[in-house]
């Protein structure tokens, strides 16, 4: 199935029974799958009148204790930013899938990774964070969407799946090996209308002096706990590497092939693939920076994650960047030729020509 279909089905398997969305390419397969499957499992599917309406519908169902999801791409995610801030400010769990497309503006429907800043730094107002998960295969889309609902409930926080058009549209085998969740424990904080307990209040408005600062301090404490316990990454062939590629999503798939090809021409290349973009694997990068000669960050953007890599390694070694913008996807040859420009060939002549592999 496609990556988009895998995201939708994994959400259903994870117990999501409320989906609200609005059509936009390249994520429409998510909406189509939800429209078909939600009635079959007794869930609710609504194609909202707008992206803004969809994110606020999410707010209501999440407050009632349901597992909820929306999805969009590029301009649609931008429209949701105020609502995402409200969800974070109300500490409401939800899952948001962003199938990135080229920008800025209307852009195009090609794959991109230019929404990184918006996702990991917080595109809406206020000091809030989302957990951001970055799959690099259709199977991993399914796995991470399933996990995203557990993380959202665990921390009462929005979780974003940051994909791209290529991952969303590609087809690969998928196994839903985790048990479908047919029962979810009640959420003590939810607005259920139950009698016999203190009333629950869900809000993000704190007009009394000092209340908002106290709330923000509690949020930051929660975020620190997430940073301490939820970092995920994959590290490949870094033990003896002279250069380590850092890439996520589609670019990580390409970088893995670059690593394999480069080894055949005498280069010791490793790969660090962040799976959580927030919290970012800064400690892993910091450790690597003590023993590798240089890093190269590969992105489908003008360079966004590269800033977090530089902040992580504290100037211990050079950080190079290669990126394609506006829907461009880096090729293995392009990346290898950039490696040849920045790193002398191992066990061979220092001067090498550009090559085609």
Residue ranges of each PLM-predicted region?
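Glycine-/acidic-rich phosphate or pyrophosphate-binding loops and their flanking alpha/beta elements
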Residues: 2-6, 220-243, 256, 260
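N-terminal alpha/beta PP-like core and its mobile active-site loop of ThDP/TPP-dependent enzymes
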Residues: 60-69, 75-135, 184
